[in-house]
């Protein structure tokens, strides 16, 4: 099979937080799907998302997504390759970040508190597990 016939790689995302930023992530990925595919040579698909209130109206389409109130369900989902953490704080968010990294899932976070207070631990855990930890926008990005 030559390059033109290969199916495009789909990177599956688990999203923690469906507030303003989380809903925007979904909208941007949906709206820019073709441009992202052309630029990256792969597709990104949010397959599961976590929110405190699943009944709250969202400013994005949640069609086809698995929805949960349990952030660990997102991290433990076997198909999730990248965890995007947008819940903030240093309690459950930190637990989720560490577990995601230890389960060999790449992580992107906008969690200023977790990076400020536990950045060295998170970076060290990511390095030991050969995992990408993205957080630039969380710190004066």
Summary of predicted features, one role per range:
Residues 1-2, 116:
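Short intrinsically disordered, low-complexity coil segments enriched in acidic
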Residues 2-103:
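N-terminal glycine-/serine-/threonine-rich beta1-alpha1-beta2 phosphate-ribose binding loop
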Residues 10, 22, 135, 140-141:
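A broadly tuned preference for mixed-charge, low-complexity surface segments
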Residues 17, 110-111:
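A secondary-structure boundary/capping signal
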Residues 94-99, 112-140:
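Rossmann-fold NAD(P)-binding glycine/threonine-rich loop
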Residues 106-108:
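A short hydrophobic/small-residue beta-strand
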């Amino acid at each position: 099979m030559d390059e033109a016939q290969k199916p495009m790689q789909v990177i599956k995302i688990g999203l923690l937080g469906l507030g303003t930023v989380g809903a925007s992530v979904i909208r941007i990925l949906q709206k820019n799907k073709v441009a992202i595919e052309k630029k990256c040579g792969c597709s990104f698909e949010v397959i599961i998302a976590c929110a405190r209130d699943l009944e709250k109206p969202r400013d994005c389409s949640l069609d086809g997504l698995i929805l949960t109130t349990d952030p660990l369900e997102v991290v433990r989902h076997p198909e999730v390759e990248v965890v995007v953490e947008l819940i903030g704080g240093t309690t459950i968010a930190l637990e989720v970040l560490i577990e995601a990294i230890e389960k060999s899932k790449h992580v992107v976070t906008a969690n200023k508190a977790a990076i400020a207070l536990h950045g060295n631990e998170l970076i060290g855990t990511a390095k030991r597990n050969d995992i990408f930890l993205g957080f630039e926008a969380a710190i004066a990005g």
